[in-house]
Amino acid sequence: MDRDEELTLENLKLCRSIIDPIIDKYDGRIFYTAGDSVIADFESPVSSVNAAIEFQKTILKRNNTIKNDFKLVWRVGIHLDDVIIEGNNIFGTGVNIAARLEAACSPGQILISGAVKEQVINKINTNIADAGTKVLKNISSSYQTFGISPSGEDIVKTNAKEYANNKKIKSYKPKLAV
């Protein structure tokens, strides 16, 4: 295996050792993982947003300690919708929309739909900024989206800016759709 691939795999495992317990802490259930992507379901939008904020902050702290290795910068899409659960699988338009929101994110960003914003706006301590209307691949409607920054700390811009401006960083953009 190429050294970069080995290092990436080690870093991915380390990030998952951070992310998975946080998802569990907020009563989330991981349904699917493939390489650098995770699909999880939560009992409430508040839980999903709090989990995303906590792990983005934790991953950012981790990345700030890495000098010449790979940094993994995650993107998170969160949507609220009905889903179908069969055994260990999760299906439905809601899953697709969350995945498309994640794909529309900048590295380090948490992007939520308007439905999620309405549920969390007065229930969590965070900054929520209008991120514009997005046309999502293979989704018939466009969606109003919002970016989240934890407690006044602009994690969205910090991670994305670091990723864009630091040419020395070899970074991959793992994904989490909830």
Identify the residue ranges that each predicted region occupies.
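N-terminal intrinsically disordered, acidic low-complexity segments at the extreme N-terminus
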Residues: 138-165
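Short beta-strand/turn micro-motifs at beta-sheet edges
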Residues: 25-28, 65-66, 165-167
